């Protein structure tokens, strides 16, 4: 085994550089959060063309005495790829376009959610959690589960729902264009855990003869209004799931333990017709092997798996792990349809 003393100077320098890059990467995200709070992406968009530093600082809600520091913030954000700089003017990059508040497809709320103190504190408590009997690092940090915390903090719940909605906009665009066949022939669909209905609205619009129902906890759907072939129903998926030709679970199961996933899936199975009559469950989730074979820069499931541990003590799953859940829940047939990088559409039939 090599030691520091036996390593070459070049190796040590590379190691230190790698370590520094990883360690200080948080500063990029903290700076991005600052940019969102100040409204920098939207200020550039509203300007209609690249902005010079003077124009930008004048458009931001900052103290005049702090204006000289904006160029240092922008320098970091340009290096991180969120903005572009040319001839002393700043513009949005394709990544930056995803940060616009009023664009339906955006990750602004997701960024703010991931950098919210409520989600950062459990990571700080991770080592403490390994040495205690708490169910999750989130409980160690806050004294209550993630879902209890969310139900008691309306502002945090709103941010969480907005983050999930932004994610659903992109997924829905792909689903109703490239994977329409998944929904063809269905007369009714229940989106379990569908939040404010972003995904279900897109499906309902694309399939006007398909009756779509969003089923979620009362606090998630209390302020939502149905329209045409879309309605909202309050309830708990651990108690029951409304009957339909198909049940949709978009990135729901990775929030839960194997035992709870089986409970959810069994309730879904009870609510759909038999296979010969077209009953099925449609799952959108990550599959670990697919990420390993993706061959791109998507850094996802290892990081997301750790987040599932920290927040819920749940996990991302392999095909083998998914198959066991399906079997335990009484499903005899399933197929994996690769969709977005490591994300899969999984069709289950009884």
Curated annotation (Swiss-Prot):
One of its GO terms (molecular function) is protein dimerization activity. GO terms for biological process: isoquinoline alkaloid biosynthetic process; methylation. SUPFAM superfamilies: S-adenosyl-L-methionine-dependent methyltransferases, Winged helix' DNA-binding domain. It catalyses: 7'-O-demethylcephaeline + S-adenosyl-L-methionine = cephaeline + S-adenosyl-L-homocysteine + H(+); cephaeline + S-adenosyl-L-methionine = emetine + S-adenosyl-L-homocysteine + H(+). Optimum pH is 6.8 with cephaeline as substrate. It is an enzyme of class 2 (transferase). GO terms for cellular component: cytosol. Pathway: Alkaloid biosynthesis. CDD domains: AdoMet_MTases (cd02440). The active site is at residue 254. Inhibited by Co(2+), Ni(2+), Zn(2+) and Mn(2+) ions. Its main location: cytoplasm. Keywords: Alkaloid metabolism, Cytoplasm, Methyltransferase, S-adenosyl-L-methionine, Transferase. Its EC number is 2.1.1.396, 2.1.1.395. InterPro entries: COMT-like, O_MeTrfase_dom, Plant_O-MeTrfase_dimerisation, SAM-dependent_MTases_sf, WH-like_DNA-bd_sf, WH_DNA-bd_sf. S-adenosyl-L-methionine binds at residues 193, 216, 236-237, 250. Coiled coil: none annotated. O-methyltransferase involved in the biosynthesis of ipecac and benzylisoquinoline monoterpenoid-isoquinoline alkaloids natural products, starting by the condensation of dopamine and secologanin, and including emetine and cephaeline, drugs used both as anti-protozoal (e.g. treatment of ameobiasis) and as emetic agents. Catalyzes successively the 7'-O-methylation of 7'-O-demethylcephaeline to produce cephaeline, and its 6'-O-methylation to produce emetine. Belongs to the class I-like SAM-binding methyltransferase superfamily. Cation-independent O-methyltransferase family. This is Cephaeline 6'-O-methyltransferase CiOMT. It comes from Carapichea ipecacuanha (Ipecac). The lineage of its organism: Eukaryota, Viridiplantae, Streptophyta, Embryophyta, Tracheophyta.
């Amino acid at each position: 085994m090599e030691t520091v003393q036996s390593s070459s100077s070049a190796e040590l320098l590379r190691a230190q550089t790698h370590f520094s890059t990883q360690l200080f990467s948080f500063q990029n995200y903290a700076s991005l959060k600052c940019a969102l709070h100040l409204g920098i992406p939207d200020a550039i968009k509203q300007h209609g063309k690249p902005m010079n530093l003077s124009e930008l600082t004048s458009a931001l809600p900052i103290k005049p005495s702090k204006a000289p520091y904006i160029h240092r913030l922008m320098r970091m954000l340009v290096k991180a790829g969120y903005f572009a700089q040319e001839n002393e003017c700043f513009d949005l990059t394709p990544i930056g376009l995803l940060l616009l508040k009023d664009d339906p497809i955006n990750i602004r709320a997701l960024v703010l959610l991931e950098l919210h103190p409520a989600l950062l504190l459990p990571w700080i408590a991770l080592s403490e959690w390994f040495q205690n009997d708490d169910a999750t690092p989130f409980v160690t940090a806050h004294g209550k589960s993630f879902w209890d915390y969310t139900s008691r903090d309306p502002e945090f719940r709103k941010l969480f729902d907005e983050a999930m909605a932004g994610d659903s906009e992109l997924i829905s665009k792909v689903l109703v264009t490239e994977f329409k066949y998944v929904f063809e022939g269905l007369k009714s669909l229940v989106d379990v855990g569908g939040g404010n209905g972003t995904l279900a609205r897109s499906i309902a619009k694309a399939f006007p003869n398909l009756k779509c129902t969003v089923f979620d906890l009362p606090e998630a759907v209390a302020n939502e209004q149905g329209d045409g072939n879309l309605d909202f129903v309050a309830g708990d998926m651990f108690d029951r799931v409304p009957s339909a030709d198909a049940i949709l679970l978009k990135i729901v199961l990775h929030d839960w333990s194997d035992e709870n996933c089986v409970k959810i899936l069994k309730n879904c199975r009870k609510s759909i017709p038999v296979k010969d009559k077209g009953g099925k469950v449609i799952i959108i989730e990550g599959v670990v092997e697919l990420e390993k074979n993706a061959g791109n820069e998507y850094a996802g499931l290892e990081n997301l798996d750790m987040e599932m541990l920290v927040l819920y003590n749940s996990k991302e799953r392999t095909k083998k792990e998914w198959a066991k859940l399906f079997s335990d829940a009484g499903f005899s047939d399933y197929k994996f349809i690769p969709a977005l990088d490591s994300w899969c559409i999984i069709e289950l039939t009884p």
